[in-house]
Amino acid sequence: MSLRNDEQTEKGAVVGKVDSQLSGPGQEEIIQVQTQKPFTTLSAIGIGYGVTNTAVGLLLVLGTGIPMGGSPVIFWGFLAMAAVGLATATTLSELISAIPHPGGQYIWVHKIAPERYRRGLSYATAMISWIAAIAIGASGNLAVPVNAFTIVTLLNPNFVYQRWMGFVVFQLINIVTCFGACFEYFLPKISKALLLVNVLSVSAIIITLFATAKTHTSAKDFFKVVNVSGWPNGVAFLIGLNGSNWCFSCLDVATHLAEEIPSPSTNIPKALIWTIVIAFSSGLLMILAVLVNVGPINTPDYSGLTVLHHITGSKAAAIGLWVPVLFLVFASVWSIQTWQSRLAWSISRESGFPLHRHFSKIFPAPFYTPIWSLIGSAIGTALFGCLYLASELAFNSLIATGILLQYASYSIPTILVLYRGRSKFQHGPFWYPKLGFMANIVMLAWTLVALIFYCFPVYSEVIPSQVNYVSAVLILIAILITSLWFLYAKKHYHVVEI
């Protein structure tokens, strides 16, 4: 059944006329597809920050910045990415305030683009957004087992991790989080609870690191550049920003809750800006707690657990701090499942997928969620997991495109706004003419920089296991989306809800 002529009832329920396959061609029935708007600004922050997860993410990506310049890359890189994150959040806030819709980026493009290119650009943006969400979901699914098995390695140095172990846990997490995202009633409650757990866990880690550290990093060492990548310092710095960049990613999550939160034109921008405030505050404290207290460390392994063990001097303490980190990463996968499914559901309402009649359905009580979109997105994530089992290098290249695809999906509507002229844009309540323009330029400039330097290998002297295939994957994704457009979407894809 496909949704048609949606209208808002007095109680906030969305009622849609649908073509019924049971009652015969041409007949219509009325079904209730959504009964409430359960999210508040706080719960939207919870689910948005639950994916961004800045402080926890910094612990996971410590090893990516150390070879590119050491502490300065991590510290200054974090500040730079916080500025980019604020610019991105401001840009998205202006767009969602003007055009509140769960489709987010692709709806903005359809609304703003010249009529001749509207459908094609909108569809490309929709698919870019969804593939990015799938790639990021796969990354989160794998982060849990890979980092969980570091506990085993810490306790038993002879343990050898095998890819099949991560694959099994990957798929189990995918199934469990998909099921957990099925119930609309619990989503805002869980997101608020997880936000509290996140704040308490991060606070406990920071306090423990300062309390247990026996050595400290001198000011000289804190700002000493140690670049072993083989690249010039400037190039290495830009490549090394990748880790910090992930900690300010996925900011569009809250925008896809536009039909599940009252007054989305004002509440979602609040959620976006507060997400950046929380991310910056918690992330800065975590970075200082680690870099100030780590001191000299004589090991090539700069994984989060190793650093915690080095600072605390206790395996038990390190593991005790690492377990809540793993839980919060697991929780972020649950938030990503919600994000993926809302995107797939919204795109399906425009007949963007071959199975759109199923993906566009909202299941009745006790779910009130797009179950088929959840399952479809989870299957996409599962397929990424199968790729990991076949080739870790191919998997890493694929998920690495996630952040670049995100920026691409943000940049397309932003470029269109600038092309038309910001003064001509029918903006919403969240609108800052000069600040917004600066935010647009900063985000677009960084998108271009990231697109170039994130395609570089980490080390200048490349060995087969370290080849960066991101550029090749981006080309394949472009070919895939183009093929889908000409084979299916050009005929079927139509945006009917603006």
Curated annotation (Swiss-Prot):
| A GO cellular component annotation in the UniProt record | membrane
Specify one Pfam family: AA_permease_2
> Basic and acidic residues bias: where?
1-10
Stored InterPro entries: AA/rel_permease1
One MF term from GO for this chain?
transmembrane transporter activity
| Ranges annotated as spanning the membrane | 42-64, 79-99, 126-146, 167-187, 193-213, 272-292, 316-336, 370-390, 398-418, 436-456, 469-489
Principal location listed in the UniProt entry: membrane
Where it sits in the cell: the answer is: Membrane
Q: Where is this region: Disordered?
A: 1-21
Lipid bilayer topology:
Multi-pass membrane protein
Task: Alphabetically list the UniProt keywords.
Answer: Glycoprotein, Membrane, Transmembrane, Transmembrane helix, Transport
Q: List glycan-bearing residues.
A: 227, 242
- Role: Transmembrane transporter; part of the gene cluster that mediates the biosynthesis of swainsonine, a cytotoxic fungal alkaloid and a potential cancer therapy drug. Does not mediate the secretion of SW and the exact role of swnT in SW biosynthesis remains to be determined.
To which protein family does this belong?
A: Belongs to the amino acid-polyamine-organocation (APC) superfamily. Amino acid/choline transporter (ACT) (TC 2.A.3.4) family.
- Protein name listed in UniProt: Swainsonine transporter swnT
